[in-house]
A protein has these predicted regions:
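PLP-dependent amino-acid enzyme catalytic core
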Residues: 1-309
Length: 309
């Protein structure tokens, strides 16, 4: 389990590396946005990926790193590896958005395509680990990744000590697990809402079952939130802070699309559907935040053609 000191150590390790992203007030939403879309790779994933790569033993890191990702975590691992001057291999789905594939290549990552599901990507990544002795950097199911994501919450509390609600998108659970852990480390009493697509209700199902549930299939406009399950480590952290969870909302693709356009039109922000999930949930009335509220905008890697719709 990630400790408060583990979160603070991650924050120290990210100083001068990750962007200390701002909070901006959006009057129509009556909420603040935490703009993780401003990270060097355009997503919060920079925090967890860099922390995990930094904490690897030098003997392992020097052989190169590998991950499996639909996009943003892959870009983050490639970026982190680039900063350490080591090789990175990113296993991506055949359906990965071009903007995310190019983002990986921008940081020197070697792209390997494998199927369409996270299981396809994981199998290929594990095979490459065995063949090439690369160090695996999981996208969400690892305490170092969770510790890095927890620094989002530390910054929120430092900038907004009276925060009462934080709304977080949910893919594999690394970010929401990090946020609940980071809020606890900061001594905040804020509650957390999770948001996931209607077509990928893995956290909703898992909380109901009391254990991580693997879905047969997922589908959503929010490609970063369609993992088949939440990770065991994130789920354990959520259960440890169960009283902090206010609820989990489900959003439709129509709501996601509207939220992306709203943020572009009203805030001049370029946000991908996964990053707009929190705004979508609030605008659709799917979350019912109490008091001072922060919506985490998790990423901004979206194809410009999206705005031609």
């Amino acid at each position: 389990m990630v400790t408060a000191e583990g979160v603070r150590e991650a924050a120290r390790g990210l100083e001068g590396v990750a962007v200390r992203t701002p909070l901006i007030w959006v009057e129509p939403l009556k909420a603040y946005l935490k703009l993780e879309s401003l990270q060097p790779v355009g997503a919060f994933k920079a925090r967890g990926a860099f922390t995990a790569v930094r904490r690897l033993p030098e003997s392992a890191r020097s052989r190169g790193v590998i991950t499996y990702s639909s996009g943003n975590h892959g870009q983050a691992v490639a970026w982190a590896a680039n900063r350490f001057g080591v090789r990175s291999v990113i296993v991506m789905p055949e359906t990965a958005p071009a903007v995310k594939v190019e983002g990986v290549k921008k940081w020197g990552g070697e792209v390997v395509f494998a199927g369409r599901t996270s299981a396809d990507r994981l199998a290929k990544a594990e095979a490459l680990v065995a063949e090439q002795h690369l160090a695996m950097v999981p996208p969400f199911d690892h305490p170092d990744v969770i510790a890095g994501q927890a620094t989002v919450a530390l910054e929120i509390v430092e900038d907004l000590p009276d925060v009462e609600t934080v709304v977080v998108p949910v893919g594999g659970g690394g970010l929401i697990a990090g946020v609940v852990t980071g809020l606890a480390a900061a001594g905040s009493r804020a509650k957390v809402w999770g948001v996931e697509p209607v077509g990928a209700p893995k956290l909703t199902r898992s909380l109901a079952a009391g254990t991580p549930v693997k879905l047969d299939r997922t589908a959503s406009l929010a490609d970063g939130l369609i993992t088949l399950t939440v990770g065991a480590a994130p789920f354990a952290h959520l259960l440890a802070q169960r009283d902090r969870l206010a609820g989990v909302a489900l959003v439709t693709d129509d709501s996601l699309r509207e939220a992306v356009h709203f943020l572009h039109r009203e805030c001049r922000l370029t946000v991908e559907p996964s990053g707009a999930a929190t705004t979508a949930a609030l605008r659709a009335g799917d979350v019912r935040p109490a008091g001072t509220t922060v919506l985490v905008v998790s990423g901004g890697n979206v194809d410009p053609k999206f705005f031609e719709d």
